[in-house]
Amino acid sequence: MASSHSSSPVPQGSSSDVFFKKEVDPTKHVRPVQSLPDVCPKEPTVTDQHRWTVYHSKVNLPAALNDPTLAKRESDFFTKTWGLGFVDTEVIPSLYLPQISKEHFIAYQQEISQREKIHERCKNICPPKDTFDRTLLHIHDKSRTDLEQVPKIFMKPDFALDDSLTFNSVLPWSHFNTAGGKGNRDAASSKLLQEKLSHYLDIVEVNIAHQISLRSEAFFHAMTSQHELQDYLKKTSQAVKMLRDKIAQIDKVMCEGSLQILRLALTRNNCVKVSNKLKLMATVHQTQPTVQVLLSTSEFVGALDLIATTQEVLQQELQGVHSFRHLGSQLCELEKLIDKMMIAEFSTYSHSDLNRPLEGECQVLEEERLVSLVFGLLEQRKLNFLEIYGEETIITAKNIIKECVINKVAQVEEIDTDAVVKLADQMRMLNFPQWIDLLKDIFSKFTIFLQRVKATLNVIHSVVLSVLDKNQRTRELEEVSQQRSAGKDNSLDTEVAYLTHEGLFISDAFSEAEPASAAVDTTSQRNTSPHSEPCSSDSVSEPECTTDSSSSKEQTPASATLGGVDIIVSEDMRLTDLELGKLASNIQELLCNASDVCHDRAVKFLMSRAKDGFLEKLNSTEFIALSRLMETYIVDTEQICGRKSTSLLGALQSQANKFVNRFHEERRTKLSLLLDNERWKQADVPAEFQDLVDSIADGKIALPDKKPAATEDRKPADVLVVEGHQYAVVGTVLLLIRIILEYCQCVDNIPSVTTDMLTRLTDLLKYFNSRSCQLVLGAGALQVVGLKTITTKNLALSSRCLQLIVHYIPVIRAHFEARLPRKQWSLLRHFDHITKDYHDHIGEISSKLIAIMDSLFDKLLSRCEVEAPAPSPCFRNICKQMTKMHEAIFDLLPKEQTQMLILRINASYKFHLKKQLSHLNVINDGGPQSGFVTADVAFYTGNLQALKGLKDLDLNMAEIWEQKR
């Protein structure tokens, strides 16, 4: 049996490759069977035979889609139902997979070729020990056949007789059953089973022995090298022990002390952190009582800062602490309560600030309280506090007027407050002096009120600007810190961090073990006070005491000093620069709105007094006083708020327009009455009018405040002397000059009516010109006044009056030009038109005088005969009329104008005389007729030149004769 199993089952290397492969495959049956997971259950189970499982699948979807035998008619299997998108497409090669060629293996071949050569050389030096031949192969086949006789159950890796199934399979119970008459047969079966098992054992032992014999040399080599291996292991063990001893000594000398220092430093830092945590928890625990104390003293900013800091600590340092799980929500509710308290406190402050007595200096009421409130409101983004202040200003403005009216009415004894219940009706019972005093009081109170509002808003504006400045400086510091941190990151990247056995970086350990104070050395501090506390609650600047959130903030809160109050601008101000800028502009707008409110209330006060026509009945002096008072108040409010309010200015302009209309209508009516009663005779000039004209010449265009006492003793003059020129005038013109000065003075007193006054004055001058023309040239005075005739003296006096007005028109123009804005200078052209109209009127009067004499000459000379005696009666009559004309105009008109009129009259005389001589055929031939004419002309010339101012007048009488041809 042993010989039958001595053949080797391993094929030899002399066989061909094909034979080798075929012979190697059966050896796989000799290997131990590997246990694989059961896919299907081995034991019979009850299953649903109709239930479909994955094991029923015969063809999968990829196989169906990639079927090479797909018929052409089935190419539209998917497209006919699902669309043209479901068609066979060619798969594009991946762009990420390179094309592999032989060049890619060149480096590998060069690297492996050397190893291959060494391998081949070793094969040649050490040939295979086992050689295969046909005999061994036969023996191997025989041994394999013997092994196949052994049941497979003995070859299982999980073979165990303690398993009942395995035991029953190996030793069936039927061989041990001794019942009945079958005992002998069962004994034989048991013996046969024992022999069979022994046979199986022999086969296995033979195969094992054969395998050992095949590897005998390896066993002997292993046994031989065992002693050498033991020596190597012993030496290695000794070397390892020595190395471990050295490492232990090195660790004890060089590392253990340092690591112990690190452990102690870490332990110390951890203890410090725990201590600081406990102190922080104790501080946080006192937050609510501290907030209550701060609120009791109205320290809203401090309370809000404390709440914000506590919230930050709860979220960062004390996150997850169970005892503080409800503190965050409680602080949020407390913060909402503080918001309501601040709004109520600011409303109370506004009421008390604006309703205090309007007397004394305009100081801010409790500036510290105001600054604290504003900072708190800004920190909480409660920006509607300005609306509260604006509403309070409206209410206060109403109360100011009401209080002033009540006080004034109480001072007037004539007003029965019991009979007149309404306050507005009581106010209307005041006369102008009382009412103007009341208005002065109201304007004074409004001015003080606005100054107080401005002072308060300036404090609020300063707070807003300080917060805005803090935001800008914080951004600058953040930019600088970012640049520095970027530089630090670059330097930290180059540092080497060593990892200890506890997983801590040494650099981190040393950084955490830095001294509590920068001025004290670490070693000396540890030696001098090893048990001292590294940090206290007060020394928050030390690194151990700083929390993560506080240490990360490099910027310190900005401080501001407002009105002597030091305020720390919190880092938690959540307002943007845009919001702060808008808030600052709203503060200025609020001041302007307060001014507008005061103006609106003043307008309502004026309108309530004007209901009964009180303002329209004011005289010039009273209205000017009212206008100046209102203009002064408008200027004062403009200086306070920097913007001119228009409501009161509009009301003043409206009343001024009404005043101008009434003023003009009164003067126009007065002038019309004067002209209608004017008899156009020369009037005496009182001394006050002469003084008035003199003051105009001195550049003072205004009426005197009082009538000088010296003028009452002076007698009236015959003429008005203006800059050395004498003007004979009628009484209407004197009063017209005074009226013109009233217009000019009204412009000075009320500059806003300059334009209206200019148009009204030009209208008045036009009216005087047209009306005087109607009365004198148009002979309207005959019916209006009852004159019998319009004499040459009337005409000359009218002309001289017009000349006086023309003299003053440039003065009036210059006065208005100095008070009109440049863009309205075009209105001054009306004075040019008026001047032209006046000159035309004066020319028409001169023409009228000439026409009178012309008709007289035509009448007298047409009946004149050249005969004795000389001078003839006709010429005597002409000389008489010329003398009357001269007497009528010489004292009224200036000398130059008189001479010009005489020359023009003389020309008319020569024209008619020449015409008559031509009619009579009288020529200058030296005959008797020419002698008579020459005597008459000489008489006329002598008589005319004998008059005042006409002595040197060149009459040129030779023109009366026809020129000889």
UniProtKB/Swiss-Prot annotation:
Coiled coil residues, start to end: 228-249
Quaternary assembly: Component of the Golgi-associated retrograde protein (GARP) complex, also called VFT (VPS fifty-three) complex, composed of VPS51, VPS52, VPS53 and VPS54. EIPR1 interacts with GARP complex and mediates its recruitment to the trans-Golgi network. Interacts with VPS51 in an EIPR1-independent manner.
Single Gene Ontology MF annotation: syntaxin binding
InterPro entries: Vps54, Vps54_C, VPS54_N
Family: Belongs to the VPS54 family.
Record field: compositional bias (Polar residues): 520-558
Superkingdom assignment: Eukaryota
Function: Acts as a component of the GARP complex that is involved in retrograde transport from early and late endosomes to the trans-Golgi network (TGN). The GARP complex is required for the maintenance of the cycling of mannose 6-phosphate receptors between the TGN and endosomes, this cycling is necessary for proper lysosomal sorting of acid hydrolases such as CTSD. Within the GARP complex, required to tether the complex to the TGN. Not involved in endocytic recycling.
Main subcellular location of this protein, as a coarse class: Golgi
Name recorded for this polypeptide: Vacuolar protein sorting-associated protein 54
GO biological process, any: lysosomal transport
Localization (cell): Golgi apparatus, trans-Golgi network; Membrane
Organism this protein belongs to: Rattus norvegicus
Residues recorded with modification Phosphoserine: S8
Tissue: Ubiquitously expressed at low level.
Gene Ontology CC terms, in alphabetical order: cytoplasm; cytosol; GARP complex; Golgi apparatus; membrane; mitochondrion; perinuclear region of cytoplasm; synapse
Region listing for Disordered, in residue ranges: 516-558
